[in-house]
Amino acid sequence: MGCCGSKEKYNGEDVPKSQRLENRPTNDVNGKQPQRQQPPNKRKNNTIRKGAASASQQNNPTSLFEITDLSLKNDIIEGLQEQPQDSDLLAQYGVLLSMEGKNKEAEESLRKAVEVDTDNSRAWQAYGEFLERTNNPKKAKEVYGEAYKHAAPKIALDEDDSSLLLSYAIFIQKSGEIDKAEKLYKRIVTSGARSSESLGRYGLFLLEVKKDVEKGGIYLKDAADIDPPSPEWCTRYSNYLKTYKKDEFEATKYQKRVSLYVN
């Protein structure tokens, strides 16, 4: 273990351990922490990642269950010691507790995260996902519904808002509320952050639920064409081309697209 001034890889860069959380507040002369300055309509995000590059290749890069693992535990606890009311860190700590099987403590931390910042879509999504994973669909529906009230009124959805509403759309689709799910999918792809996951999920919905082969294919292609390419959605579109278009040549191109991509 290096000394306190040593540098370690963090978010793909060499960053001193003491600076791992961006813009950590420092106490003023009275011992109080100043208010964090935030751009208008843009909330600060203190989520700790292993690295931005690896996260971009995950199925859902804004889901805390995708970008968090136990190797981050010490960093998250350290962050909470300095900022005990930070919504991002509380949510991420809840995910860690869930991974350790401490579901009661996990829910307490996740609930506190959304109480501290009701506009934190990533925390709401983590809370909803946690309830799904612990087989509590009734409570999950309540949480997603409450989260929707905070995210839906926004004219433009950012990445976290889109990811939250996508999780909600998938959840209510599984519950059989097809019309409501379709409205959510449409909202995400028209007003949300453009991502392979949202485009692909809507494409699958159109293909498998609405039985619209042509329109479903359009969205699957859009998902596969996004850079950096998603292995999952390139493969899904390749399979679509083989199954519905009998186009082996194009299917092979998309199957190879990930390995040929140069950033």
From Swiss-Prot:
Compositional bias, Basic and acidic residues, is annotated for: 1-25
**According to the record, where are the TPR repeats?**
87-120, 121-154, 162-195
Question: Which domain of life does this protein belong to?
Answer: Eukaryota
Do you know which Pfam families this protein is assigned to? Answer: TPR_8
Record's InterPro entries? CFAP70, TPR-like_helical_dom_sf, TPR_rpt
Keywords of the record, alphabetical order, are: Repeat, TPR repeat
Give the PROSITE patterns listed for this entry.
TPR (PS50005), TPR_REGION (PS50293)
Q: Which residues form the signal peptide?
A: none
Q: Kindly provide the name given to this protein in its UniProt entry.
A: TPR repeat-containing protein DDB_G0285095
Q: Which organism is it from?
A: Dictyostelium discoideum
What are the leading ranks of the lineage? Eukaryota, Amoebozoa, Evosea, Eumycetozoa, Dictyostelia
